[in-house]
Amino acid sequence: MNDKLELKNNLKEMRMEKKLSQAALADLVGVSRNTISSIETGQFNPTAKLALLLCIALDKKFEDIFYF
């Protein structure tokens, strides 16, 4: 039985709502623009620390950005 949960996100929508570019958000949380792009496209799941930093930078709750 393969019940692997896949973390999905609304990061792009939340970022655009704040009128931030990928590069600007990346600078705010201390990662590369490529990392933000990879999270937005589901190619990379952020660590708990990075997810928290993204929530703080976007002034959103975890469940507003990330879901299963």
Which stretches of residues belong to each language-model region?
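Short, charged recognition helix plus adjacent turn
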Residues: 1, 64-68
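Central "turn" residue of the DNA-binding helix-turn-helix
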Residues: 19, 30, 41-42, 59
